Amino acid sequence: MKPEYKPFVDALIELAIREDIGDGDHTSLCCIPATEKGRMRLLCKQEGILAGIEIAQLVLRRLDPDMQFEQILRDGDRVKPGDVAFYVSGRLQSLLQAERILLNIMQRMSGVATQTAVYADKIKDLHTKVLDTRKTTPGMRVLDKMAVKIGGGENHRMGLFDMILLKDNHIDFAGGIRPAIEGAKAYLKAKGKNIPIECEVRSLEDIDEVFAAGGVDRIMFDNFTPELTRQAVAKVAGRCGTESSGGITLDTLREYAETGVDFISVGALTHQIKSLDMSLKAC
């Protein structure tokens, strides 16, 4: 895990514990002795890409630092029904408290990783890389971003703070591409910040405006057809990075990648996923 992710993950785990356990897991407290210990296993019940083991360990140890964790599989492993990802031993009350929290996290992360792998594998022989977006579940973006990387994709910006992305609304409100880019560069200089600038374009003519304003780190082709994307890539001619975005599906992904564009951003990696089926069972 990247060091900068840790505070977000710790905060998410604390929130998950508060919302699920509240003032106590009264079901476990009423029928399981506090000193009783046991062992459980994480059982995979569906084919896919495993993700979230690192987070599961943090959940378990937050609830009981004395948990004994025996890892069998790793994040990024391809799994099938019947595979065991890990065994964990400790106080039964703590194991039962952790069960749903870690399953919710691992099932979603594995779903994102599995979806990403489908997209990434389709163009793995090409130069183009698949990017995620900010279309994530509020509060879970770090986990979604981690899962995308595990599945073979690449991360776009984390949020509004680590890249300037001049999209259509920014450009329109700023009065055009040139004033938007010039304003962005002046702002970064005044603030002493060093973050990349990306600018969305809606036509081939817009590309000329970008370079007339001094250029940016990456140009985003918004809702271009594959043929128009090919022309746009040729027009940029390697002067900056390129990205395709807008309505690109698994069916059209390869056609866009074959244009030579550097990146394709796909919101479906994180907002149209199905959680991977798995369970935590006594053994």
Listing of model-derived features with the role each one plays in the protein:
Residues 250:
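Cys/His-rich Zn2+-binding cysteine-cluster or related metal-binding knuckle/ribbon modules and their
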Residues 1-213, 218, 227-235, 243, ...:
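Acidic/glycine-rich phosphate/pyrophosphate-binding loops and surrounding catalytic core
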Residues 222-223, 246, 268-269:
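Short secondary-structure boundary segments
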Residues 240:
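A short helix->loop->beta-strand "cap" motif at the edges of active sites that frequently abuts
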Residues 279-283:
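Active-site loop ensemble at the mouth of alpha/beta enzyme cores that anchors a bound cofactor
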